A protein has these predicted regions:
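Interfacial aromatic-anchored transmembrane helix boundaries in multi-pass membrane proteins
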Residues: 27-36, 66-97
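Membrane-water interface at transmembrane helix exits
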Residues: 30, 52, 70, 74, ...
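Hydrophobic transmembrane alpha-helices
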Residues: 2-65
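Short helix-perturbing small/polar motifs within transmembrane alpha-helices
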Residues: 83-126
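Hydrophobic alpha-helical transmembrane segments
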Residues: 12-17, 60-64, 80, 84, ...
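Membrane-embedded alpha-helical hairpins and interfacial helices in multi-pass inner-membrane proteins
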Residues: 109-196, 201, 205
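Residue-level hotspots within the lipid-embedded alpha helices of multi-pass solute transporters
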Residues: 37, 82-83, 171-176
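Membrane-helix interfacial "entry" motifs
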Residues: 3, 7, 11, 71-78, ...
Length: 212
């Protein structure tokens, strides 16, 4: 009976605590001018940890709690943006590792979710600020292509299609690295919190060893 009551209490306390922690990380990421890269890495970890410790139902409750908290604190657009991709990605990775799915599945679906979430954020923020932020991304893509062409001294002028394609490929690559880094970070940290994720594939053991 005591054990049952303890579990019930933890099922209430842990979602509240970890959802609040994740919400604070999101607020810090949104408003603080420094530490963005580190905050992005640790932002999904509280919900993932909740999933591993308490299961899918409790993790979903924690995600809903975080959504409601941020919706109240930051408004409908800024509060909802944490879902894309951080909230959804955290739930997916937590579910994958809770079900002991292999890294290839959790990573591949994870970076797809991350890429889709990036485009949703660009659209939402463009609506919020009243400017097309995709233009800024394509300009950055053109600048990268221009530097590469100039470095190799190539007689090449990229078309708008190539510029857009390079921008999309860069976003996909960024999300691939980001999700893989979360895997390595979780594999390193979670055993110290009495939670484990599946072992990495042999092919990427070298990256994991570097991360550890």
């Amino acid at each position: 009976m005591k054990l049952s009551k303890k579990n019930e209490a933890l099922n209430i306390i842990e979602p509240s605590y970890l959802a609040s922690l994740s919400s604070l990380l999101w607020v810090a990421l949104y408003y603080l001018p420094i530490g963005g890269a580190l905050l992005r890495l640790i932002l999904p970890l509280p919900i993932i940890l909740l999933h591993l410790r308490r299961g899918t139902r409790t993790a979903f409750e924690g995600l809903i709690l975080q959504f409601l908290l941020l919706f109240i604190l930051m408004g409908p657009i800024r509060g909802t943006l944490f879902l894309f991709p951080y909230g959804i990605l955290a739930f997916w990775l937590g579910w994958s590792w809770f079900k002991e799915k292999n890294w290839w599945l959790s990573w591949s679906v994870g970076f797809i979710l991350g890429t889709l979430g990036f485009f949703i954020r660009v659209f939402a923020l463009s609506t919020l600020v009243g400017d097309n932020l995709w233009i800024i991304i394509t300009r950055a893509s053109f600048g990268l292509i221009d530097k590469f062409v100039g470095l190799l001294n190539l007689p090449f002028s990229p078309s708008i299609i190539i510029i857009q394609l390079v921008a999309i490929l860069l976003i996909i690559f960024q999300e691939m690295v980001y999700v893989l880094t979360i895997h390595i970070l979780a594999y390193s940290l979670f055993p110290r919190l009495n939670s484990n994720i599946p072992d990495p594939p042999k092919m990427i053991n070298g990256f994991v060893d570097i991360g550890l």
